[in-house]
A protein has these predicted regions:
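Generic preference for well-ordered secondary structure
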Residues: 53, 89-96, 136, 152
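Short, flexible coil/linker segments at or flanking structured domains
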Residues: 55-57, 93-96, 131, 156
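A surface-exposed partner-binding patch
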Residues: 1-85, 144-178
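Alpha-helix initiation/capping motif
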Residues: 80, 110, 137-138, 164
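Compact, glycine/acidic-enriched structural inserts
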Residues: 89-128
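An amphipathic alpha-helical core segment
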Residues: 113-155
Length: 178
């Protein structure tokens, strides 16, 4: 049994034995005027955080539930499994595929900063970045991060535990949604 989180504001009060939350939620950020790591992430890597009061209209419907926190400006969304930014980070592509990206937000940012070609594995498009090691190190310092000894993007894979439907109606056709 799946419970639609989009129509239930107080999901935690719902007690359905064995029910799995489905749908999407949003983690939004407070916009500031100053340049910080997150504005650099947007400018340099095309990762646009979802700002408070500016929630996007998103039609796709994930099962189980995902919490969206950013988009790529091209119909792709970044999300976590609903337990905050310490939980695994996923990417929902415009082809409605769910990709596992990293074990948590910190590791995700580390990968995006130091491996700017990480998205090639998902899109197949060649990324071109001309940043020196010093520029990458400075970028990482905005988040208190340094380069990893392992290639973090090698862990990217299609996540089979999530199904992404075109919309809630398509999900209802295929799943047992309440």
């Amino acid at each position: 049994v799946y419970i639609d989180v989009e129509s239930r504001e107080k999901l935690l009060e719902i007690e359905v034995k064995g029910a799995v939350p489905a749908g999407k939620r949003f983690d939004s950020f407070v916009m500031t005027c100053e340049e910080n790591g997150f504005t650099s992430l947007q400018r340099r890597r095309g990762i646009n955080l979802i700002w408070e009061g500016m929630l996007p209209k998103v039609d796709f419907y994930p099962v189980p539930s995902l919490t969206l926190f950013a988009h790529d400006g091209r119909c792709g969304y970044f999300a976590h499994g609903g337990k905050g930014l310490e939980s695994p980070i996923y990417f929902v592509s415009e082809k409605l595929e769910c990709w596992y990206l990293a074990e948590n937000f910190r590791t995700f940012v580390q990968m995006v900063v130091f491996e700017p070609d990480w998205k090639e594995k998902i899109t197949g498009e060649k990324a071109v970045f001309e940043e020196s090691h010093e520029e990458l190190a400075d970028f990482g310092m905005l988040f208190g991060l340094s380069s990893s000894d392992e290639k973090l993007s090698e862990k990217i894979h299609v996540e089979s535990n999530y199904k992404i439907f075109e919309n809630i109606e398509k999900a209802r056709e295929k799943m047992s949604l309440r």
